[in-house]
Amino acid sequence: MNYSDVLANARQCIGKYCKACPVCNGVACKNQIPGPGAKGVGDTAIRNYNKWADIRVNMDTLCENGTPDTHVELFGRSFKYPFFAGPVGAVNLHYSDTYTDMTYNDVLVRACAESGIAAFTGDGTNPDVMTMATKAIGNADGCGVPTIKPWNIDTIKEKMAQAKASGCFAVAMDVDAAGLPFLKNMTPPAGSKSVAELAEIVKLAERPFIVKGVMTVKGALKAKEAGAAAIVVSNHGGRVLDQCPATAEVLPEIAAALKGTGVKVLVDGGIRTGVDVFKALALGADGVLICRPFVTAVYGGGAEGVKCYIDKLAGELADTMQMCGAHSISEITADMVRAK
């Protein structure tokens, strides 16, 4: 199976909203919620993709020859590659009933673990979403990151208990999720969090806590103040606020603000290839999350589809490193890329 096969297979079963496009750039699905689309006019997801494309890589092969080492150390673990599958919940709502949250997470979490990376898992108004996600992580010996929505504190405590029982190595919260149209005025309630509220949640985790949905230096410093081990520079793929800047536009300043603090910086939004992963690392990220294409990979090929996509990313990353003179992840530097 190759990636073209994965896309072709996915188009047969992924549902009416996602088109399993050859290039997942947000154009065909904009303003499709339910579905994978972005909010409002839908141009934030498109901008995310386009801004990575605007960054070019600087080739330099006047260096020692060698096989690039793509390993990275994060959250007390060693990963084969510096990228992770992003969180998705309620797949039968946003895609199709070919998969339930249980079967989707079982495939994704296990396939990612077997390939040397980890999957972040989703949450939703239906409590079964988190239950199924944490069961899948438990079945994979804790190799996954449950991602909790910013509910009221009582609901967070319940879901945090499930997360910890899974043996996960870290817990995340997508703090921007209160902007999701399908969470507005729902029960349980979700909303923004103060630094004090976030600090209380961080303590509940009792393991590295990742704040997902940071788009400003100010927000990054608040997450640091609350005790976060890492942040994810993210606008939720354009799904929570229309007319946002792209993550590639704000990543460098946020990474610079957190440099030397010990807080790790991850980024998502429109990253589709191993070359994009390289660009993100060059701009200061410690790691990358990729979401929508992993959904396509599961629907298009199950565990084999996930492995196919991971291998594709890994090959592209290693090739770019080799052609730019970086023999390890730590050797990827800002001067290896240039903005248009």
Explain the meaning of each model-derived region.
Residues 1-27, 219, 238-261, 271-340:
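Conserved active-site-proximal phosphate/metal-binding subdomains
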Residues 49-59, 112, 116, 164-167, ...:
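Structural signal for hydrophobic packing residues in well-ordered secondary-structure cores
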Residues 90-98:
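N-terminal binding-site loop/beta-alpha segment at the start of enzyme catalytic domains
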Residues 2-80, 332:
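An N-cap/entry alpha-helix motif that binds or orients negatively charged groups
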Residues 80-89:
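Outer membrane beta-barrel
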Residues 103-152:
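A gly/proline- and charged-residue-enriched helix-loop-helix capping module
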Residues 90-91, 123-128, 176:
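Short glycine-enriched loops at secondary-structure junctions
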Residues 99, 109-110, 138-139, 151-267, ...:
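Alpha/beta enzyme core
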